[in-house]
């Protein structure tokens, strides 16, 4: 949904003919994600490129194998995928003179659920001030509303499945954001108190959130 909203914002501002959508799948990318990414690009009328990361990932994995020998796979291997995607996208940006837009929402950036030199690579982030719940709201609003200044086609751009399916970075089997973070309505409510209202843990508890959730978000 983050990528879909960023693509939509770019198409609205610049025209879909000036937007390039790039899908960079791995073996952990679900079939539904492949279908949804292509659908968003087609709905917008934007260019769609398909760039698998397997060969690059295999090369990096083999290069590091002697150094990583005896150590269990962990978040390092997950971040390799994100950073490889960032490298490939920056190469496209460099070659074709196009600005790479990043897709990290305010919720992810606030709690560090993003990868430096990975999905944070790029020249501008259109959704940097949107919490994840606002991203979902924007997707629903965009499907139902159109304004004369919008350069994207009217109608449904983000398929309902994109908005409704559990969010996942898809960097390992069965991964969901909720494995590492509180549900986004909870996370965003706590972040709003701690960041936007400059509140405290006690303010979060007073608002109805658990101390455990508030402490986990703060740290």
Predicted regions and their residues:
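ATP/NTP-dependent adenylation/nucleotidyl-transfer catalytic domains that generate, transfer
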Residues: 1-219
């Amino acid at each position: 949904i983050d990528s879909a909203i960023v693509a939509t914002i770019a198409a609205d501002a610049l025209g879909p003919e000036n937007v390039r959508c790039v899908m960079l799948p791995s073996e952990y990318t679900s079939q539904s994600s492949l279908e949804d990414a292509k659908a968003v690009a087609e709905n917008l009328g934007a260019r769609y490129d398909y760039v698998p990361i397997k060969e690059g990932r295999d090369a990096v994995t083999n290069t590091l194998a002697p150094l990583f020998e005896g150590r269990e796979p962990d978040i390092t291997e997950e971040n390799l995928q994100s950073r490889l995607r960032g490298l490939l996208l920056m190469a496209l940006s460099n070659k074709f003179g196009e600005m790479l837009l990043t897709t990290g929402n305010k919720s992810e950036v606030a709690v560090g659920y993003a990868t430096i030199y990975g999905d944070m690579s790029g020249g501008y982030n259109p959704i940097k001030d949107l919490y994840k719940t606002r991203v979902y709201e924007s997707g629903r609003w965009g499907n139902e509303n159109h304004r004369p200044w919008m350069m994207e086609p009217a109608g449904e751009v983000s398929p309902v499945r994109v908005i409704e399916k559990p969010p996942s970075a898809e960097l390992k089997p069965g991964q969901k954001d909720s494995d590492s973070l509180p549900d986004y309505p909870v996370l965003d409510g706590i972040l709003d108190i701690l960041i936007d209202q400059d509140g405290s843990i006690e303010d979060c508890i007073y608002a109805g959130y658990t101390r455990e959730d508030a402490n986990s978000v703060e740290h």
